Design a protein with these regions (language model features):
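N-terminal low-structure segments adjacent to metalloprotease catalytic domains
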Residues: 1-23
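Acidic/histidine-rich, surface-exposed loop or edge segments in extracytoplasmic proteins
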Residues: 16-31, 78-84
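Second-shell loop/turn segments in exported
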Residues: 29-35, 86-91, 95-96, 137-141
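Active-site scaffold of zinc-dependent metalloenzymes
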Residues: 64-95, 111-112
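Metalloprotease/metallohydrolase-associated module, dominated by Zn2+-dependent proteases
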Residues: 118-166
Length: 166
């Protein structure tokens, strides 16, 4: 069978899968890739206080955690209680990374600490939600809009106040 053009053995497929997996693992980390930021560290520690030590995953274009090829800044994965930061999509923008970490971290608080009940009331959210975010939130399922809007608002407060709320 080795003479048939394009045919590979199981061994070759296994070796290729192992190489692919090795490359994939290198794109995942519990710390930001090539970025040293005490500010990100402090925010991350607050999230880890809620979810546990290995609760933030930094993905640099990883396929495994759903970042590659999608316009995602990050997400909170309820099933694993895991904040996934799609660092490759941020193009090194620290302010954007911080905003996303606070936003996704707040989703963790909403789920883990508040049982899906918003911290802010509708008037507080409406008064603080920027128009562009209000428009964007309409792309979400109606049941998710209030929590998504709140996470966008909470992400904008200063770090010390955010950490205190978490």
């Amino acid at each position: 069978f080795s003479c048939i053009k394009g045919h590979t053995t199981d061994t070759a497929r296994i070796k290729q899968a192992a190489r692919d997996h090795g490359r994939e693992i290198k794109t995942m980390s519990t710390t930001p890739h090539h970025l040293n930021s005490p500010r990100l560290d402090r925010l991350g520690e607050a999230i880890q206080h809620v979810l546990g030590q290995r609760s933030i995953l930094w993905s640099n274009n990883s396929k495994t955690w759903g970042c590659k090829g999608r316009n995602l800044y990050g997400y909170y994965r309820i099933k694993n209680e895991l904040v996934v930061m799609c660092q490759g999509f941020h193009n090194g923008d620290l302010i954007e990374l911080i905003d996303t970490l606070k936003h996704e971290g707040w989703h963790a608080v909403q789920h883990r600490c508040r049982n899906g009940v918003p911290y802010l009331d509708d008037q507080q959210i409406a008064a603080r939600l920027p128009q562009r975010d209000a428009i964007n939130v309409h792309n979400y399922h109606p049941k998710q809009r209030r929590l998504e809007s709140e996470a966008r608002v909470i992400a904008k407060i200063d770090d010390a106040q955010w950490i205190q709320l978490v």
